[in-house]
Amino acid sequence: NATKYKIVFKENAGAETLLKDFAGLQAGEVIDSSVMNLNSLKSFVQEAIEEAKSKNVLLSAHLKATMMKISDPIVFGAIVETFFKDVFTKYAETFDSLDVNPNNGLADLFDKIKGNAQEAEIKADIEAALANGPRVAMVNSDKGITNFHVPSDIIVDASMAALVRGGGKMWNKEGKEDDTVCIIPDRAYAGFYQSV
């Protein structure tokens, strides 16, 4: 029989957040779901950060945020927040007051801090995190746009195909190709690219 469903997140404390209001299902349709542990994801990301730094290679995240509009921006935000952990901790109150959300990437963060009294300090701390962490793959080296600027800039099926064709390399900030550690936190893609 045809029916309808809604998606509600229920916290351990009992509070509920409606994620999707009622939507229809046709007779015979199946709905599936999964669970993501944010702490495990951040540990995985931290390991990738450390691996890229120790091997002196680029770090890159590959998602499908254009199609996976709920989960992948959250995953992207976890990557951004883990890489810039000290920045997000230090400026937590400022970011909260400006409605900065790591799920939207650095471009949105830069836009929201524009004109803020701490803008220069925040930008300096972001630059320090980039200088002290592993080198980050670039979307546009000429414009200084990193892999962490916008969640939809690196689409896994296109970006990984280009990386494989390029021998496992992406662009660094100097506009040259460099070996890369890829964060692919999606089992639909990760297993395939792990074997490649």
Task: List the predicted regions and their residue ranges.
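Extended, well-ordered protein cores
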Residues: 1-77, 86-196
